[in-house]
Amino acid sequence: MLQPKRTKFRKQMTGHNRGLAHRGSKVSFGEFALKSVSRGRLTARQIEAARRALTRHVKRGGKIWIRVFPDKPVTKKPLEVRMGKGKGNVEYWVAQIQPGKVLYEIEGVSEELAREAFALAAAKLPLATTFVKRTVM
């Protein structure tokens, strides 16, 4: 699973996930990309599940880039514990996603295969996504 090696603080406030993605919104490494259309949170498990779906479909061909990293801790109190007594323990890590954020990139495969692979990966994610190609200026 993806998670930071070390952080300055163990726990973070919930915060807001507003606005559009300006950074990480262009296809930078590969030819084709899976881009978010809606906002939400991706857990480390969801990112890994989609990555596995991608790599299994493209088999030996192509190179894949993961453009998101879960760097925000989400806490949860144990079951059947009364409210109060401080914030719960870190349960899992999430990446906050805004519309326009590139999630995965791929190169070295045909467009048809890339579309199929991204469709399988998108089924594992709780966000609406779209397929984009690299634009050469």
UniProtKB/Swiss-Prot annotation:
GO MF annotations in UniProt: rRNA binding; structural constituent of ribosome; tRNA binding
Domain of life, source organism: Bacteria
Any Gene Ontology CC annotation: cytosolic large ribosomal subunit
CDD domains named in the record: Ribosomal_L16_L10e (cd01433)
A Gene Ontology biological process term: translation
UniProtKB keywords: Ribonucleoprotein, Ribosomal protein, RNA-binding, rRNA-binding, tRNA-binding
Pfam families, alphabetized: Ribosomal_L16 (PF00252)
Subunit comment: Part of the 50S ribosomal subunit.
Biological role: Binds 23S rRNA and is also seen to make contacts with the A and possibly P site tRNAs.
Similarity remark: Belongs to the universal ribosomal protein uL16 family.
Name by which UniProt lists this protein: Large ribosomal subunit protein uL16
Organism in which the protein naturally occurs: Azotobacter vinelandii (strain DJ / ATCC BAA-1303)
